[in-house]
Amino acid sequence: MQEQNPIVLMNFSGIYREEEFWKNRQVSWIELQDVCGTNCYCDEEAIAEINKRTENYPTAGIHFIDSGNYHYMTRLWLTRMDQPFCLLVYDNHTDMQPPAFGGILSCGGWIAAALEELENLKYVILVGPDEAAYEQVDENLKDRVIFLSREKLQVMNDEERNWFLRETVSEVSVSYTHLRAHETS
């Protein structure tokens, strides 16, 4: 494995060239703009190419994965986890929708795919989607999801939020947080 930085920028759309936050830091830059079949959905050929380009980068660290169109990248990174873990996700969406095109990996269904396919993923802590979105999640997945809705967050006081974090996140052995600089919904 080549020498790596703990910050990885995955460049799908070119947006990071316009950003400043990384320019005075040591980062690992993975160029992915030329990979076809990646926008919102990721087909098998694209998965193979992405895995090839990322294979020498560590799973640990901070991975900036471009916009929400590429959230499924977390699913690809998680395949490398060789010990049991739980996943912490802050998002406005559940990302547990059934795939619109067969079994193709998507930005809207990657959490469901991870829960169904990854043996080491024990459960997901999902913070942020609204109650209506969570009601649409497949019942078979809900037993492995700890959910905190946007509505509940708005009415919780500091003590309740701290309790939730102590009781759930304290058990997280590995957590991944989605950082979305350009997505507002």
What are these regions (language model features)?
Residues V8-M10, L88, I125-V127, I146-L148:
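Hydrophobic/aromatic beta-strand patches that form the interior of the parallel beta-sheet core
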Residues H63-A132:
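Active-site histidine-anchored catalytic micro-motif
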Residues P6-V8, G61, C86-L88, E171:
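Structural motif
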Residues T177-T184:
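Conserved small/polar residues in nucleotide/adenosyl-binding loops
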Residues E31-A60, S67:
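Active-site-flanking structural segment that lines cofactor/substrate pockets
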Residues M1-D43:
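N-terminal glycine-rich anion-binding loop in soluble enzyme alpha/beta folds
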Residues G103-E116, E131-A133, F147-S170:
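Active-site glycine-rich loop that binds ribose-phosphate moieties when present
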Residues Y16-E20, A132-V137:
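Short, charged/polar "capping" segments at the starts of alpha-helices
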